[in-house]
């Protein structure tokens, strides 16, 4: 059996991370999202000056306005952060 590629391993890690914070209910509420951000994106939060950052992220991700972040919305969060990181990389790091 072939070992998973690095990208496949990363995808599995993102999937497992979502379920770690969502639990059996298969979505994250605001508290779950806060725990995820504190645990997995602490550097990102540290650089935010707005105390409402988590509430704004929750509002952006909560498509149905039920106070829930589903897996699709979580993927949107990850994709948005990856895009921002890529833009930074292209602008600052790649030029070195």
From Swiss-Prot:
Pfam hit, one: S_100
Domain of life (superkingdom): Eukaryota
Protein name: Protein S100-A10
GO cellular component entries: cytoplasm; extracellular space
Gene Ontology molecular functions: calcium ion binding; calcium-dependent protein binding
SUPFAM superfamilies tied to this protein: EF-hand
Function: Because p10 induces the dimerization of annexin II (p36), it may function as a regulator of protein phosphorylation in that the p36 monomer is the preferred target (in vitro) of tyrosine-specific kinase.
Gene3D superfamilies xref list: EF-hand (1.10.238.10)
Ancestral calcium site: annotated segments: 62-73
Misc note: Does not appear to bind calcium. Contains 2 ancestral calcium site related to EF-hand domains that have lost their ability to bind calcium.
Listed InterPro entries: EF-hand-dom_pair, S100-A10, S100_Ca-bd_sub
Quaternary structure annotation from Swiss-Prot or TrEMBL: Tetramer of 2 light chains (p10) and 2 heavy chains (annexin II).
